[in-house]
Regions:
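Kelch-like beta-propeller repeat domains
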Residues: 1-307
Length: 307
């Protein structure tokens, strides 16, 4: 597992948004067992290793999405207040080969890329990447209601249909199920948290892509939230944990599982996930039947079965 960029605050000296940006590329092997209290992260490249000539920019709230066995697309993100990068330009796309490591800077407008955005979500299937929503990186707080498909074989960014699509949204989840359905849920839209009774669906297996709303059982729902961790489990269910409110001040500790195979789809709370504590902007990864959680605010590292 590779992790790139983000924010660090070793001495808790900054507010969350003001914490320093970084360009660190880290690696953690998930092929062997390890003690989650001392995870064996390897520092691959970044400002602390100037012997590596190929390095990426400082970034936060971006995405890194693998589209084949060698390369990933870095897209969007905030470069920080001291960066010379213009936040409204369409120049955020980069290619990364983490094994080298090799960062490839691309020209503005490459492959018809859209404007830089942050706090968006991406999901991939069969080499294609879906980029959903996001917030402008210029501090205005404006949200994007335009969503894109990135086809790396051409390469080209293609705007997805707007009819019945998610509105301007950020801090949400985008997950592609084994059957090819893309689900989008949670986050913030119009200054309000999006309730988990809303879930947008796009069947990526169809040649004519069309958005629809999923049917969700209303009897048991997580409280609305943004910036939560989410992961697709091996059995096709989706796990979420933590997150924050619309002001980004709270840090929730509860966890839930969505079963999209049922009609209507159902949410079930998993009490054990509250042991992780409250956190936001963290990650969750499925590793051989267990879920690895890490980082976020507040930050620590944990390993839990998916329940």
């Amino acid at each position: 597992m590779f992790l790139y960029g983000g924010k660090t605050d070793l001495y808790n000296a900054f507010g969350y948004d003001a914490a320093p940006w970084n360009n660190d590329l880290l690696f953690l092997s998930l092929s062997t067992a390890f003690d989650p209290s001392v995870p064996p992260w390897q520092y691959v490249s970044g400002s602390e290793n100037t012997s590596i000539s190929s390095q990426g920019p400082t970034l936060a709230w971006h995405t890194v999405s693998a589209f084949n066995s060698s390369f990933s697309l870095i897209f969007g993100g905030s470069t920080g207040p001291l960066s010379p990068t213009l936040p409204d330009n369409s120049d955020s796309a980069q290619l990364l080969n983490p094994m080298q490591p090799l960062f490839i800077t691309l020209p503005e407008g490459w492959a018809g890329e859209p404007q830089r955005r942050m706090r968006h979500a991406t999901a991939s299937i069969n080499g294609s990447l879906y980029i959903i929503g996001g917030e402008t990186a210029d501090g205005s707080g404006n949200l994007f209601s335009t969503h894109y498909l990135f086809n790396p074989s051409t390469p080209i960014f293609i705007q997805l249909p707007s009819q019945n699509a998610p509105p301007g949204i950020m801090g949400h989840a985008a997950v592609i199920l084994p059957d090819g359905r893309l689900l989008v849920f949670g986050g913030i839209s119009g200054g309000q948290l999006v309730p988990f009774s809303s879930c947008w669906v796009l069947d990526t297996t169809q040649s004519n892509l069309m958005w629809a709303l999923a049917s969700i059982d209303q009897s048991s729902l997580p409280s609305a939230r943004s910036s939560f961790a989410f992961v697709l489990l091996s059995d096709g269910r989706i796990l979420i944990q933590g997150g924050t409110d619309a002001t980004f001040e709270a840090a929730f500790d509860d966890g839930w599982i969505l079963d999209p195979s049922r009609s209507p789809m159902t949410w079930t709370q998993v009490p054990a996930l509250s042991q992780l504590g409250g956190r936001k902007d963290h990650f969750a990864v499925n590793a051989g039947g267990q879920v690895v959680f890490g980082f976020g605010a507040p930050s620590h590292f944990s390993l839990r079965p998916p329940c």
